[in-house]
């Protein structure tokens, strides 16, 4: 929105709500630290791709395949139980194992069986339209609900577009051609490999 204060123009601002588990935000099951077995253990979880060791990003795990960091967003790092850490780590490991296989997009055994594909497609479309330089790598969320409701991995919601729509002096994001998903800089904030695999899937 464009902000004016007492008739004085103050610029363009992007207003966004914080990402959190809530019936009116990310509507997944509440996961308490004592829920460590059965269906209760399967959700809900919110993971975030972002810089490690900054702000609330002080707990998580690294991918066994490309080393990228999955930050715990919900439950928080100081609230997640060991069994819950083991569960979500194994779920992501199983997902990534499918994604590195040559048959990752097989209708019967591929990633479509454990992901909400539409949410990943929506995420890619929105990130590409906004040319958000942080896309896929930073301020990017995925979540998993409890199995008895919908245990598939889901992308989103989209968040933090302050470097979108050409409002950035790197990554050539001001250009109206080309694909942002092909921008993957070196330096510790790489895009995890499976975004490219989803992009390539016909």
Per-region residue spans from a language model:
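Phosphate/dinucleotide-binding and metal-coordinating scaffold of catalytic cores
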Residues: 1-202
